[in-house]
Amino acid sequence: MSFLQKIGAWEHLDTDRAQEYQEMQVWDGETDSRITFDWSADSSPFENLPTVATMTENANLVRGLLSRIAASGDENVSIFSNTTVSSIENGTDHPDGPDLSAWPVLSLAPTGAAQSQPPTRITARLLVGADGINSPVRRFADIATEGWDYNRHGVVATLSLADPDQVAFPIGTRTAYQRFLRSLGGPVALLPLPNNHATLVWSTTVENAAYLKSLSPKAFIAMVNAAFRLPMTDLKYMMRMERPATSASDYEDSHESELTWRLQHTPPASHVPPMVNGVQEGSVASFPLRFRHASTYISPRVALVGDAAHVIHPLAGQGLNLGMGDVASLSKTIEYAVDHGMDIGDILSLERYTAERWAVNAKIGGVCDMVHKLYNVPGQGPVAWGRSLGLEIIDRLPFVKGFLMKNAEG
């Protein structure tokens, strides 16, 4: 958020669609070991807790950035909507003109009713690839990546929550929740949005993801509520429930009634989110979970940022933050080059950027990968005991939690 404020974009976002939260509850679904991330150790008990992080929708962020560009009135900025890059290739050395043989040349083509006709070709002094995991810019620059697929999918949805109990959920405090469900393939997380809404990110096996997406809204809601409240044995049973051969309403009732019955026979769970009571139509989707890291973020006249440079497991929610950190660092690198009369596309100018960001992103991605693997070790032996002990120890060491949160903030 600090970078968005610095560049003047935050004031263009709809702040009614941004939600701060003051703590994050993380616990093991098999041992119930728990850690609470907040700034209580650094604040007065008579004050509201400081913000841990801020959530907003991607659409709100994009609109805010476009609004900031429009408000700048900079005639040197051109935005081409409904336009695709059909190819990227090196330019040519003109005998009577500049040598552009090392400059990227982009061929553009309209994809629909564009507001203005884009140029057919653009020659770039510096081409920034912010074009995702399958980055064409990265392929053009012949930059290799290393990594692997997790054979897991992240199921996402926008949910509505019941009004929180003001005793269990104090006024002025919003909480994010994450429960590790090893037997189901990964953690489930609920991140707060304004007006009693939340974003779901449930990392699970490919089969479980397909099952969840096939459910009716009522059955899906029942499964999400179960994921934060039921013991693992009960949750695994509900994940295997078959569709009955009768009507869809019976199918919906079977999950709801199963959850109701099992909650009646389960000790009440503490520090769980409010009950989910709705799911936004069309919001349930999934995406494959992967780890990727480019061997470098730069080549002559090319720089990579965000998912084009690195993709990590979403369990720490750091994907966008890392990308924003890349953009902030690259901006400073370009500014330094301009101030010192350097060529912004020269590899020597860009080395400052890759030196600042590559190791940071590798460290955070590696930690997320290690935690994912640690919570997917089968059995109840020493590894499970070590996980629980580690959570409990860290929860009792405020300076360690503070260090982890500051690193997560970037």
Protein language model features and the residues they cover:
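Short FAD-binding loop at a beta-strand-to-alpha-helix junction that anchors the flavin cofactor
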Residues: 295-315
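Conserved N-terminal glycine-rich FAD pyrophosphate-binding loop of Rossmann-like flavoproteins
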Residues: 1-5
